[in-house]
Amino acid sequence: DMMPHCADKLKNHYEITYLGHGWESIVTRMKDAGYDVAQITFATDYIEEVRKHDVQFTPIAIGTGTKGKVLDALSNGLLVVGTPFALENIAVENGVSCVEYHSNEELLAALTDIPHHVEKYEVMAEKGREAIFREHGRKRISQQLIDLFK
């Protein structure tokens, strides 16, 4: 609900794409508020679609059902802006390799800052990508699994 009300601060800096079903009413509200918004209800190649974007918002409030999508975004070089639940147990650090927010005010501050400091956030996204390959890579995880049986 926050973004339609903050349109004047953000709408000229972002093109927003919603992936998946169930976003229709929010897409309409965002368009009515002046945002450039699209919805892709089904992507035949999810990873290819993710790679077309720069930032992924992960406002997960409870549960871990989309944790894989957070890892997909990070490993493909997107800046992830998410809640503590979204980033829980992922080897990233707030302000270094991702942006973690705890309130709508923190989210708005980050979204307002990103267009004015693009290079800073590009570096952050790259550090997130590197962290995922280093800490969550197949080789490291499989070695840890093998070590359990030694």
Model-derived regions: residue spans:
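Cofactor-binding loop segments of dinucleotide-utilizing enzymes, especially the Rossmann-like FAD-
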Residues: 21, 83, 103
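Conserved catalytic-core segment of nucleotide-activated headgroup transferases in glycan assembly
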Residues: 1-33, 39-52
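Acidic donor-binding loop of glycosyltransferase active sites
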Residues: 51-65, 76-78
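Short acidic/histidine- and often glycine-rich active-site loop of Leloir-type glycosyltransferases
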Residues: 84-100
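A structural motif in glycosyltransferase catalytic domains
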Residues: 1-3, 16, 73, 107, ...
